[in-house]
Amino acid sequence: MNEYQIRLVTGPAVEPVSLSEAKIDLRVDHDDDDTLIAALITAARMEAEGLARRSFVNQTLDLSLTNWPADGCIRLPLPPVASVTSITYYKEDNTSATMSSSDYITVTDVDPAVITLGLNKTWPSDALRPVAPIRVRYVAGYGATAASVPERYRALIRSLVLVRYESRDELTAPQERQLQNIRNALRMDYGW
């Protein structure tokens, strides 16, 4: 089995829901809670991405692998994938090399996106260092703007923000059920 780790390199430049949108939902017409609401938006986006196992607004990720895949396919978590920036590997002597993009094919119209070898190509045969020897850097997300995120996800994030804002002091039983329904809706998309 090929173990992997995912690391955020560059986070999204914007959130899927703006502060002004959230304030309208919350019926807040003052600026006193702006910092809190902005933090709730970020937390809601991160929770939603984790539950849906998707990236909403473009962000750069590093996928670290322990070895080359036996089946010839590298599956990229947290779709959708916009592009693969590079595949870098570290040899036994800790020097790095980058695969030529002509050696592999990135298939982004499937979930999860897949990297496969090009025709008559093979994974590098160099001996690899023992820890995190392979790094795939890629951009994942629906696009660079909040408008590119499907409305379904934006609505669920807005709902998370609303419940969290209203339950700052204490979470009631109806609010807990509402949170669970939102979480279940986000988990429904996870099918890969």
Predicted regions and their residues:
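Divalent metal-cofactor coordination and adjacent catalytic microenvironments
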Residues: 1-192
